[in-house]
Amino acid sequence: MAALGKAEESQGCFGLFLLLPGPSMQPRLFVLVALSVLLLSGRAGALTEGLYCGRQVCYDVLGVSRDASKGDIARAYRQLARKYHPDRYRPGEPPGPDGETRESAQEKFLLVATAYETLKDEETRKDYDYMLDHPEEYYRHYYHYYSRRLAPKVDVRIVILVSVCAISIFQYYSWWSSYNEAINYLATVTKYRIQAMEIAKQQGLLNRTKEKGKNRRSKEEIKSEEEEIIRDIIKNKIDIKGGYQKPQIFDILLFQIILFPYYIFKYISWYVHWIYTFNIQGKEYGEEEKLYLIRRNMKMSQSQFDTLEEHRKNSFLEQKLWIKENYEVYKLEQEEEMKKKMASDPRWKRYRRWMKNEGPGRLTFADD
């Protein structure tokens, strides 16, 4: 087929040469046409250089036709692999009856293996057949060949799964670290420490640390055990909200992805129930629904809203902030109150005075 392409190109160039006028221009044009033919023929002959089986056809290497099945290709490969396997030849051994040496057999074995690797995969075989049928698409063949060779062999799904698991493990341990950090901080706060000590005395937990006799311990051991008791009481009695709350296994990324369909179904069910109950039937909001609307108006997350004290939530309910108009009035009042505080705050006064007199410092590259 490549030879046929060369012949057609040569004939086309020769026809162009015959149609060109002027005897004085013929030598120059002859050189131009000859160079074009040489370049085109060289490119056509190098179409498969360095790709797949090189200048040989992979089907011919295995001795099969282009219509051969995977089974036929595998059988031909096994037969030729046994024949040309380098282990059958010793180094320095003279050529056998078939004229093969260890070096030539190794070259043929590698060529047979390359042909088999090319034809056993459906996608690679399609690319190779396309190259045989369209040798003129030189750069396309190079792109497809090396894109497959350099493509990662690991399944992308495995990479994603491992990444999600790694992120989930990091999340879980970092959350535990933040939670323990919060507990250690609360154990140093006088208010919570005194309450924890009172609870420990009522439960008789501190009396055990001051045992005498054989079980007597050093002051450092007693102090360490008391600290551990206080930390345990704070863990059990104080409900920490927000970013320092106690980690839950179902909050990590892996379980969030697994439970995502459930959360979607739950949200749709809740939304349909809300529309039917309050928009269609016209029922009044309960306390939970009112707090949800207040939180949505304030654009706060659930964890942020949970950190608010109960008296503030009750104040929001008394002001009926679930109603949009009431919330807008409340928002303006809060902004005005904040402006008054800033105006009377000595620190803000000093800052405004400094900005007025001196202003922020400037960077300059001018020479003094």
Swiss-Prot record:
Residues 57-132 form the J domain. It comes from the Eukaryota. Keywords: Chaperone, Membrane, Transmembrane, Transmembrane helix. It holds the Pfam family DnaJ. This is DnaJ homolog subfamily C member 25. The chain crosses the membrane at residues 25-47, 158-178, 252-272. Gene3D superfamilies: DnaJ domain. It is found in: Membrane. It is a multi-pass membrane protein. GO terms for biological process: protein folding. Belongs to the DNAJC25 family. InterPro entries: DnaJ_domain, DNAJC25-like, J_dom_sf. GO terms for cellular component: membrane.
